[in-house]
A protein has these predicted regions:
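Conserved PLP-binding active-site segment in aminotransferase class I/II-type PLP enzymes
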Residues: 1-66, 88, 274, 284, ...
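Conserved PLP-dependent catalytic core of the aminotransferase class-I/II
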Residues: 35, 205-208, 273-299, 324-332
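Conserved PLP-anchoring active-site segment centered on the Schiff-base-forming lysine
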Residues: 58-113, 121, 329
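Conserved PLP-binding active-site segment of the aspartate aminotransferase-like
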Residues: 173, 309-318, 348-355, 367-379
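Conserved glycine-rich beta-strand-loop-beta hairpin in the small C-terminal domain of fold type I
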Residues: 253-269, 280-287, 298-315
């Protein structure tokens, strides 16, 4: 039987689940809060049921402080980020991405920021740190807040400091596909007392789940811990594939993070460096094996940073060639993904003229991106198979044959 390897997965052992259960009876959220404060060296920390809710709480807090209404984010990122912006009564404004760094393009950001910009949302895409110094300098010129989206970059660093700590406020995600997963969950960190005060008001208004709902989340977390392991993923694949999101989210629920999840998160964080190091090692291996090859682009990494690859991004010069390699890689049992098939301005009607594409890089990127899993259930042998498929395809001239 050929074992399948999922595109995402955090190794949550039965011991971690047991520790999570024990912690959940001992104010585990407070313990996890202390852990995150220590990791980020931040004074304030708040948990919610998702990164989306964390972002929403931040935006609601900033609205209490400022009358500005525009929120700038990259045109290629999670489309779900639009939902909390609109729900908070704010206006999303997009800027293009860089085909060099795969992150927000600084020149494009400079063109769309103005006196009505409430905040800039730099996203560390794929666990690749963005140039936060450049972002902060631009924000300071306009007295604009910076909300640092470190949802996919937990464990990554810039100048030995973790991503998520450079903006006025930052947030992380513990969702299924993130670097450290407790099924779902989000976390806010800040040192800004004014922002923290307003976040506290929003946070305390979040509802707490009843016992049945908490038990369901615990059961789903345990099921996920089993399902992401290659053997069980293979056995359960038909059922699991039906549960994967294929439709666009139109809303989101907000509530308090559960004690059991906080307990598991606390247990996981004690061994987080092993998980982060695996992701880095796997990404570094792919980078070394694929750099310099004609027909593909790899991200230019920020100097003095460490990327903890959420997944490893490869940009192909040709869309049809990417599709062929995507199928070949998945036929080996290793689940590569294409992430978001369209940039945000082609998903939601935000008033942009699509005939004159205002964000050509984001559109180009969405059509040619392929992501390779880097989580701890991967290994060098599996990664070498992927490298061979890509190199063989490039050496055969297949990518040239499909060029238009």
């Amino acid at each position: 039987m050929k074992l399948l390897t999922p595109s995402a997965g955090t190794p949550v052992s039965s011991l971690y689940l047991l520790k999570g259960l024990i912690f959940s009876f001992n104010k585990s959220t407070i313990t996890f809060e202390t852990t995150i404060k220590s990791y980020t060296n931040k004074k304030y920390c708040y948990f919610a049921n998702s990164g989306t809710t964390a972002f929403y709480v931040i935006l609601k807090a900033l609205r209490r402080i400022s009358k500005k209404t525009e929120v700038i984010l990259p045109a290629y990122t999670a489309p779900s980020l639009i939902l909390p912006i609109k729900k908070a009564g704010l206006k999303p404004v997009l800027c293009d991405i860089s085909l060099k760094t795969f992150n927000m393009d600084i020149k494009s950001l400079n063109k769309c920021i103005n006196e009505n910009t409430l905040c800039i949302v730099p996203v560390h895409m794929f666990g690749l740190p963005i140039d936060m110094d450049a972002i902060m300098k631009i924000a300071q010129q306009y007295s604009t807040f910076v909300v640092e989206d470190a949802a996919s970059s937990l464990g990554a660093t810039i100048n030995s400091q973790p991503t998520g700590v450079f903006g006025d406020v930052g947030f992380y995600s513990f969702n299924r596909g993130k670097n450290l997963s407790t099924l779902s969950g989000g976390c806010i960190v800040t040192d800004n007392e004014e922002i923290a005060k307003e976040i506290e008001l929003e946070y305390t208004s979040l509802p707490k789940l009843g016992l049945n709902a908490r038990l369901k989340i615990a059961a789903r977390l345990i099921a996920l811990a089993v399902a992401v392991r290659p053997l069980f993923y293979t056995i359960l694949y038909k059922k699991i594939s039906k549960l994967k999101h294929t439709t666009l989210h139109t809303d989101f629920d907000s509530f308090i993070y559960t004690n059991f999840q906080a307990g598991v998160g606390c247990a996981l964080f004690g061994h987080a460096s092993k998980i982060f190091n695996k992701r880095y090692d796997h990404g570094a291996f792919l980078f070394d094996m694929l750099k310099g090859l004609k027909g593909i682009l790899l991200p230019k990494l920020l100097p003095h940073s460490v990327s903890v690859f959420n997944q490893f991004p490869i940009l192909f010069g040709n869309e049809e060639f990417k599709e062929i390699l995507y199928k070949k890689i998945n036929e080996t049992g290793i689940e590569s993904t294409k992430l978001y098939p369209d940039p945000i301005h082609r998903v939601y009607n935000l008033g942009y003229d699509l005939d004159k594409d205002p964000f050509p890089n984001a559109t180009y990127f969405s059509r040619r991106l392929l992501l390779i899993p880097t989580h701890p259930f991967m290994d060098i042998e599996k990664l070498s198979i992927i490298v061979k498929i890509i190199k063989d395809g490039l050496l055969s001239g297949m990518h040239v044959r499909y060029d238009t």
